[in-house]
Amino acid sequence: MGRFLSCVLLTLSLPAAAQAPDWQLISQSRSNDQLVYWYVDASSIVRTDEYLRALLRTSWSAPQYGPDQTAYQSSTYLNYFDCGKRMIAYTGNTYYRNIEPVGLPVHEEPEQPLAQLTFQAVTPGSAGETRLDFVCKFRSKQFMT
């Protein structure tokens, strides 16, 4: 009976562990006397039709304020990457009070269908280019192994 219970508990814990984000810090910068950190959840990178899709996160060392003056210190969002054309589309922003995206969000913007998204060319040297380079290189390494 004890062995059975252990197996049940182990099985119940697996989905949660499999879904835990694998945040990889890909860049940081200084802006207005604060640090800005950009992360990619490496476990979320998947191919969707001709694009790569990944969950990203931005965190700030000091609170930011939305239009209604709600404070937040991190946001997560979905990016679609066209590696060949070097373009990105964004959707599904979720904002959190703390530097880690945990707990209840303070604001959420719904994910839009891929067909409704606008792809934008990345600016050389920008955080967008860093995200695109990381995701496209990371995924190509995964396909080669």
Region spans (language model):
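Sec-dependent signal peptide recognition
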Residues: 1-9
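N-terminal signal peptide c-region/cleavage motif recognized by signal peptidases
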Residues: 13-17
